[in-house]
Amino acid sequence: MTNKKADVGIFGGSGFYSFMEDIEEVSIKTPYGEPSDNLFLGKIGSATVAFLPRHGRKHSIPPHKINYRANLWAMKELGITRIISPCAVGSLQKEITPGDFVVSDQYVDRTRGRIDTFYDGPIATHVSAADPYCPELRELAIRATEESKVKCHKTGTIVVIQGPRFSTKSESKWFTLMGWSTINMTQYPEAHLARELEMCVVNIALATDYDCGLVGDVLPVSHNEVMLVFQKNLDKLRNVLFKLITVIPKERAKCKCNEILKHARFT
């Protein structure tokens, strides 16, 4: 337990919290083990924000080894009800160009073996994932991209692969033919676990490259190339996040995210 409190939680890459003020580092223990790192608390406008580098501050934890439950529970310990989950993605569609933003409204889980629920019994709990992202936060995020004057796609399906390897060309072509928008390694189970805890969650994806199967002469992607594009657009993403955080209302009046378990349990 901790006596620290925050309004909004952000998962992201190391150094992402540098735009916050009055930063304090906090260690939180959870029933599910250690989070990826300590959390960094700071101010953005009037909001207290908690930041957690999902891969650890030295990017030492691969996506399939992240303790997603501990990360989300640490946010819950701070009293957080809103989660912003930005990430780098590969584009699966030509109209989504490197540097574009996508406010995802759906995901497809192609991971395997990840622990993806808090509810292993004794009460059967079946949380709906029909609309996995908070409609109110999505609306506010889209508005923030518009005010920041960045190119944004207002909907998109993000396919989440196991990692740490990138896709084969055949896999990538299949994802494109399915009509999915982007590809990533961390959105699942991160987004779903937030939902199980009745948190509002929004994904803001930044396209860093075209995935390998989209165009015939695209060279295989490398992690270094992804990070170069991500760093180039980091200021834009920070600006979007700042605008979003400053307009999130205190009360959750326009969504039902806080009532998810009411319709999920058999007693």
Identify what each model region corresponds to:
Residues 81-82, 181, 200:
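Short acidic/polar active-site loop segments enriched in Thr and Asp
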Residues 212-264:
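His/Asp/Glu-rich mid-to-C-terminal helical/loop segments that flank catalytic regions of hydrolases
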Residues 185-223:
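Zn-dependent metallopeptidase/amidohydrolase metal-coordination segment
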Residues 1-130:
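Metabolite-binding pocket within alpha/beta catalytic cores that recognizes anionic/polar moieties
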Residues 76-79, 176, 195:
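Non-catalytic positions within long, well-ordered alpha-helices that form the structural scaffold/packing
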Residues 72, 172, 188-191:
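Generic hydrophobic/aromatic pocket-lining and core-packing "Φ" positions
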Residues 132-177:
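Active-site rim beta-loop-alpha module in soluble metabolic enzymes
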